[in-house]
């Protein structure tokens, strides 16, 4: 027998190298075979419910790292709630209608207008479902636990029917109406867009300063006066029908030197404008309030048949321009709102493709709107006072990445103004994480206009509206309920397969159709109405779910997207929000803080991460970042996370190895019988348990990450395990000292494995497979540990905190001795602590082997007054370090005066000799193979 065989060296097959890319799919297959999702639901049946409603990702293309952040975050919450005693069914969903799928088919050569519509829509459907399957596999590869066999998809007939029922309820309350208001118009998509489909980019535009000649000054301005206006969209001058001034703003009539014209500009902008216009000097002729100029008539710059009325508007400011806004009601929301008060013509001079229409005039007809600035400049002639290029934020179609325009076209709207205050009241009742989300959503709802819900596309849910012979729109509850039932049985495809009369209730009549003839709407619904009614199609429709949901979790862009649309529809129909709480997350940027894009080559694919590092590394990254703000990720960052993971894994591996001979049923030592340092570690660990449980409750994953890393690296690796191994290796296998520490090891191992399962499910499942004494087949079926408190715990923590300070001081003294070549490693040291009475009292109260804790072979405690001048001194304590006296025990590696060669060929100290002689009589009788001496 060899001497080292008398040591209790930990043994385990748990590998140091994780091999996650290969092992994770195996665990996922095992979970699926065991149907763990269903088992967890059955286990928690009848317990308090928690419902997180999944915001549906768009079913197109591979998932990106933003999807991963979102789905992993949800999975962490679902898993932590499930293991904390809640019934948490989680139904994943997909958004499957909309323009992007049409665009994909177009790129594949599919020509929609040359096909039978039903065939085209079936192609859209099949493509969408193929993307659902692809993304489902991607999400499952990330370890996301969900009801994957029963997801919701917005193209499902039942979902479409429930969506129609939401529309019908809103229509029944009078919230759906048709109007020709200006809407965001995408010429590249040939469709109206909702606010949520807009993104902003900075662009350069040519802005023009020009003047309208006064035609009727109403006795205030004479006809030789010109009102100066500014525009950043020259094409809209073709539809300008008014000039808006601020009612309380001051305007001056000035005559530049050498000019026979006089001009009206805002007083607050005159100096800057004079410089732009080259007015070296000017004479001020009069001053007027904006309200005094109301109803003055001016001439259109080139169309003599058009008069432009001076009107009043509160949206006019002195931030830029001239303080006078040219007003084209067909091309802007403010223009429309103020223009309709004065009954100005709502002229639209750009068609659906962005081309100037015939009513713009022969010089413009057929030209692309963004290319007509030179024509406008030419038409203005000497009325043009200045032009300049400005850089400003401009709206773009989020899908095509092309600029859009405001354009008044007949559209269907969902009113927001009719019940805006009700929505705002519901926001006040909702909990937000982070808290600033409340203000953000509140302001968006407060300031938003009505919602344009119609789209001039094919792939989507049809608007269930019919028209009588006299043009009356029909969307009564009877009709929409009937359409909903048809969709539920046949899918929305039936809308395109049947004539209007066959889609209406049998025997339906309407006074507007004396001949019984009807037509149907050909527009479809905004896809945000699809997902925005999911509270009805999912949470309210499934028996195992509930409405309102406990939580909606999405990116911060969804304040103007899904959070917004869901809130509007839910309050409109039922008077309350669809959620009790909202958690929003920032965007995922690259390692330099830049937006990810194919052109930059900085996109991180979750699939690539899973192949290189494993999904658990990506999951640990999610837990490591502050998602309240934008977060950064790169392969380098993931490499750093992987290194942290390695430290956690290897520490837990040490615990597995050193509890391999520990049976909790027979070997556990009661807390009261633990050693002082073991009690301290138990208390510290239970504080960690409390921190983690609280952080899960608050969805604060970063706190969990930091707390676990600190506990593993500082409390365990750098302190407790650093000296505990000398006990568990050296002491007799069944000794009280060893079993005490193993009790703490095992308690930490089992509980931290459970606590980390929501974040690292593959790794903890692997660890769990080595914990043969635990009853649950899978750790996911276990319950989260509760934090315990202990008597005198605060006093214990205070005492050990003081010791940690002393330990740091002692380590400094040992380091100085090491540098002076007095010792090599700390076990070569004889440390003398010169202590004040207070420090002596502390060391006595700790009731511990201080030499063991400081990892020195010999320790002496002396009076502080006896400290030599060269001692390493601190307040109340000083240290000297000498080389320990004696020989190195081959078994304990400590220097001990009692170390000597024994009769059984072992060069060991008395303590090790006693252990050997009591526990290895055969070796004592036969002698060890080699002594090393």
UniProtKB/Swiss-Prot annotation:
A motif ('HIGH' region) lies at residues 57-67. It is found in: Cytoplasm. One of its GO terms (biological process) is isoleucyl-tRNA aminoacylation. InterPro entries: aa-tRNA-synth_I_CS, aa-tRNA-synth_Ia, Anticodon_Ile_BEm, Ile-tRNA-ligase, Ile-tRNA-ligase_type1, Ile-tRNA_ligase, M/V/L/I-tRNA-synth_anticd-bd, Rossmann-like_a/b/a_fold. One of its GO terms (cellular component) is cytosol. Its EC number is 6.1.1.5. One of its GO terms (molecular function) is tRNA binding. Signal peptide: none annotated. L-isoleucyl-5'-AMP binds at residue 554. It comes from the Bacteria. IleRS has two distinct active sites: one for aminoacylation and one for editing. The misactivated valine is translocated from the active site to the editing site, which sterically excludes the correctly activated isoleucine. The single editing site contains two valyl binding pockets, one specific for each substrate (Val-AMP or Val-tRNA(Ile)). This is Isoleucine--tRNA ligase. It comes from Streptococcus pyogenes serotype M3 (strain ATCC BAA-595 / MGAS315).
